[in-house]
Amino acid sequence: MKRIGILTSGGDAPGMNAAVRAVAGKAMAEGLEAYGINYGFAGLVAGDIHKIEAADLDGVIQRGGTLLYSARYPEFAHEEGQLKGIEQLKRFGIDALVVIGGDGSYHGALRLTEHGYNTIGLPGTIDNDIPYTDFTIGFDTAVNTNVQALDRIYDTAHSHDRTFVVEVMGRGAGDVALWSGVSIGATAIVVPEVDWDMEEIANKIKHNRANGHRSNLIVLAEGVMGAQEFVEKLSEYGDFDARGNTIAHMQRGGNPTAKDRVMASKMGAYAVELLLAGKGGLAVGIQNNQLVNHNILDLFESKHDVEVSLDKLNEEISFK
């Protein structure tokens, strides 16, 4: 093996650049060449590929986004797209690949391995919805971004005795909402994995107001419903002077936290070690602070465990 390709795919996540840097840096340290593939699988098929030089990696570990850019390319699910991608890999003499992204990206990684190109997947998504890893690259930064925004929303909510419903990302998973909500002492956290009742939430707001609490923040996972829809349904149970707010794509940008930088660096270097050992079709993760790898097929047959106990914790320590 002489050349390793690297691509980022799907939604960007803070820390992707740290992962790219780690893969390329480890490859160079092992006497290999690293090639960057722009715009994910779309760029692979189009041949948008370049050699990564050491100077290209200066200052990237602290940058958000992805220096390799990203795109969604559903056409890669079909064999025609996969074969076009393989043609480009052969053209550039790339022997193996590291794919950084979410579960859709892992499907592409598995297909390439089946076609004879060892490929390793790294979990790059703020949603934290990948099985067999405690945390995904970008999750910690997204939660910290939310906490900063929610703290600011709390200030204005407190000034006006208002209720705010703040929608956060996570796709179908509630991790982002749960961690963000506990971190700011939310009145309620609403996620897909936990049963909830609108009337109970309304009664809690009324109870809080009656006991001198001037503001209420509800953290809402986007997989449940939108913030404005939630506000409208909440208004059926009383006049709460509620406002809907969506933090949106701010969660996917910004300088990655130290945790995301270190985790991405560990995973990236480990991916190269696996490729040097002749392995492919694997997904890298961190469990109990240890690097692990699992067959990508196992991920498709499993479901990420959301820490739903955080919702109970938030209920127990909230003021009654």
Swiss-Prot record:
UniProt GO MF annotations: 6-phosphofructokinase activity; AMP binding; ATP binding; fructose-6-phosphate binding; identical protein binding; metal ion binding; monosaccharide binding
Cofactor(s) needed for function: Mg(2+)
Function of the protein: Catalyzes the phosphorylation of D-fructose 6-phosphate to fructose 1,6-bisphosphate by ATP, the first committing step of glycolysis.
Binding site for ATP: 11, 72-73, 102-105
Matching PROSITE patterns: PHOSPHOFRUCTOKINASE (PS00433)
Quaternary structure annotation from Swiss-Prot or TrEMBL: Homotetramer.
Protein known as: ATP-dependent 6-phosphofructokinase
GO terms for cellular component: 6-phosphofructokinase complex
Keywords of this entry: Allosteric enzyme, ATP-binding, Cytoplasm, Glycolysis, Kinase, Magnesium, Metal-binding, Nucleotide-binding, Transferase
Biological processes per GO annotation: canonical glycolysis; fructose 1,6-bisphosphate metabolic process; fructose 6-phosphate metabolic process
Pathway listed: Carbohydrate degradation; glycolysis; D-glyceraldehyde 3-phosphate and glycerone phosphate from D-glucose: step 3/4
Species of provenance: Lactiplantibacillus plantarum (strain ATCC BAA-793 / NCIMB 8826 / WCFS1) (Lactobacillus plantarum)
Active site: 127 (proton acceptor)
Family under the similarity heading: Belongs to the phosphofructokinase type A (PFKA) family. ATP-dependent PFK group I subfamily. Prokaryotic clade 'B1' sub-subfamily.
Gene3D superfamilies to which the protein is assigned, alphabetical: 3.40.50.450, Phosphofructokinase domain (3.40.50.460)
NCBIfam families hit by this protein: PFKA_ATP, PRK03202.1
Subcellular localization: Cytoplasm
Residues reported in the UniProt entry to bind substrate: 125-127, 162, 169-171, 222, 243, 249-252
